Amino acid sequence: MIRPTKRDPLGILDENLTRRTWNAYNAYINLYAEVKLPLGFKYRLNATPDLSFERNTSYENIYDFGLRNNAVSNMTEYRYQKNNFLIENLLTFDQTFGKHKISALLGYSYQNYHTRYILASGKGLPEGITEVGAATQDRMNDTWSKESALTSIISRVFYSYDNRYLITATYRRDGSSKFAKENRYGHFPSVSVGWNIAEEHFMEQSKSWMDQLKLRAGYGILGNQEIDDYMYTSVITSNINYPDGNGGLISGAFPKDFANPAIKWEETEMTNIGVDMAFMNSRLMITGDWYRKNTKD
């Protein structure tokens, strides 16, 4: 029988000399409950947790294969966790009265996003021990976490008369933890109108070859919060090592970025005018649009 040793080339096959592991777990769940109410109302609750966890380890024992060797055992382990929760409460209304059609939505949503990272490493582990906490030399650990939340009030009203004249109005009020309290909330309205000319009585003779002729126009304000977390305040970074002048290291901390408490929602004003046309049982379709977009802040 040949036994691998730390100086034998066969030793590289020994899992006690080098070991790397990677484990990842993900779970995405979409839960909902819906209740129909009188008079055309309906209530719906959506709950969507999105969870992930990752753990990686890397271990090297002492070995010597000539040109390739490792004099001190070492190990590194890191863990990463991400949780994203979204809860929505939606109340809708949908009714038709003769030629009048009305639908409406009122909702509230809350989203929480949290991530956490942990890293630990060290050298000089006792023989047969693969726990980074047992390291006797150059022990180091680092950890950070960040969290953000978004709350939204959503409303929308749609009205149509005889499928000829259409209007939709929406309003959102969003609050983001990425901004300071005085700039936390943004207000984003929009309105759009449409005219189905092909449904007018004076277009009756054209229906044999024209299926659709619709004019539409819209104006709205969109909000954008896609920035890094905590930009409105000063973030301290720790676990920074400095030489002590005697061959050792001193742990310290320093401000990572300059605070900007004036940062706020980016707003984009959009204006759109368009036309939709369809001919010969929709064999030929034409769509034209004119846009104007203005972004500020």
Segments (PLM) and residue ranges:
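Extracellular/periplasmic, surface-exposed regions of secreted and cell-surface proteins
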Residues: 2-60, 70-297
